[in-house]
């Protein structure tokens, strides 16, 4: 009988406490997620101290539930994987401490995982990867184009120079009176409206793969503020549609341009904003028109947000490549793919 590789994975980089058991890098045996959205809504965003406290309250319970749901014990495990960055330092420390404790107590290998690599590997639950490939990572904290020449190899070829796309969604949502997190509601409203305001598409035509969303955010806020000053009521659906169209146009244009320069076999769309239906549809259409030879892998909706299943998938790859940490592993809130290159 072939031995199963079972990874117990921890994710606590922001405001979701998640523990998962993954078999052989692609089969989800359990994925427990304790969300904190209700606790942060009244603040209009994530409060680090509140997030850390919730992680402390939930981590043991989530671990027990993940093992029970998977039908495994600590003795069955192959390794323990954990997000050690990027993210909120207090939140990261809870997951890192839990993972280190379990790995030490049960004499298991401890595998460090970059949170953003985890988002990429969420697409592994859809299909095996074929290299070289390109990843469009769009989340609340990051917007990046990542080129993967081979497994376990990451090169950032484009990234945001200011706000991440998801961050802009939440700030725009706040102006429109939408509860945090705003992305899903903005997407739903956008589907009912039209691009009547024609907000700027920053850097869309520039000969690089970088992004910028701060100017769009400012233009949106100014439009709403000026209308308020005049006592004018703007159509919320058209506002949402105009904002989203600007974001999506830039994301798709930059991705297609990257594919022109970096021939790949697959394109991954991942991260929290990857759940956006407008982005999914336009990227799929753009790919079909310009690069039909490239297979689009979209992370399943339930694995677009922060979760430990994706950390287990990435952790399995890291485990096979010999990535190990010891008791000195610490949270690295500013971790980037560049760090991984230096370490390897």
From Swiss-Prot:
Subcellular location: Cytoplasm
Family annotation (PROSITE patterns): GLYCOPROTEASE
Transmembrane residue ranges: none
InterPro entries in the record: ATPase_NBD, Gcp-like_dom, KAE1/TsaD, Peptidase_M22_CS, TsaD
Cofactor note as given: Binds 1 Fe(2+) ion per subunit.
EC number: 2.3.1.234
Catalyzed reaction equations: L-threonylcarbamoyladenylate + adenosine(37) in tRNA = N(6)-L-threonylcarbamoyladenosine(37) in tRNA + AMP + H(+)
Binding site for Fe cation: 115, 119, 306
Keyword Nucleotide-binding set for record: no
Record key words, sorted: Acyltransferase, Cytoplasm, Iron, Metal-binding, Transferase, tRNA processing
Entry GO CC: cytoplasm
Annotated GO MF terms: iron ion binding; N(6)-L-threonylcarbamoyladenine synthase activity
GO biological process: tRNA threonylcarbamoyladenosine modification
NCBIfam families: gcp_kae1, T6A_TsaD_YgjD
Recorded family membership: Belongs to the KAE1 / TsaD family.
UniProt name for this protein: tRNA N6-adenosine threonylcarbamoyltransferase
Gene: tsaD
């Amino acid at each position: 009988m072939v031995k199963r590789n079972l990874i117990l994975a921890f994710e606590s980089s922001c405001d979701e406490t998640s523990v998962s058991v993954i078999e052989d890098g692609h089969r989800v045996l359990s994925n427990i997620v304790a969300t904190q959205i209700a606790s942060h809504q009244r603040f209009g965003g994530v409060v680090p101290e509140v997030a850390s406290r919730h992680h402390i309250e939930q981590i043991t319970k989530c671990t027990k539930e993940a093992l029970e749901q998977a039908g495994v014990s600590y003795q069955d495990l192959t390794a323990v994987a954990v997000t050690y960055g990027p993210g909120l330092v207090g939140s990261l420390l809870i997951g890192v401490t839990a993972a280190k404790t379990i790995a030490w107590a049960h004499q298991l290998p401890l595998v460090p995982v970059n949170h953003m690599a985890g988002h990429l590997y969420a697409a592994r639950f859809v299909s095996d990867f074929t290299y070289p490939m390109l990843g469009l990572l769009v989340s609340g904290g990051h917007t990046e184009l990542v080129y993967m020449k081979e497994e376990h190899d990451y090169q950032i070829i484009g990234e945001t120079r200011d706000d991440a796309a998801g961050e802009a969604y939440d700030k725009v949502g706040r102006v429109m009176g939408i509860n945090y997190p705003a992305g899903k509601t903005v997407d739903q409203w956008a589907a009912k409206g039209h691009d009547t305001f024609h907000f700027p598409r920053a850097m869309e035509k520039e000969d690089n793969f970088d992004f910028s969303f701060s100017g769009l955010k400012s233009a949106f806020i100014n439009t709403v503020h000026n209308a308020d000053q005049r006592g004018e009521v703007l159509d919320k659906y058209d506002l949402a549609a105009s904002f989203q169209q600007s974001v999506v146009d830039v994301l798709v244009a930059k991705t297609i341009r990257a594919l022109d320069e970096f021939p790949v076999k697959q394109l991954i769309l991942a991260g929290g904003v990857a759940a956006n239906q407008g982005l999914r549809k336009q990227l799929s259409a753009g790919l079909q028109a310009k690069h039909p030879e490239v297979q689009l892998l979209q992370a399943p909706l339930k694995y677009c947000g922060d979760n430990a299943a994706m950390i287990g998938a990435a952790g399995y790859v890291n485990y096979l490549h010999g990535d190990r940490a010891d008791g000195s592993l610490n949270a690295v809130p500013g971790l980037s793919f560049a760090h991984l290159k230096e370490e390897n």
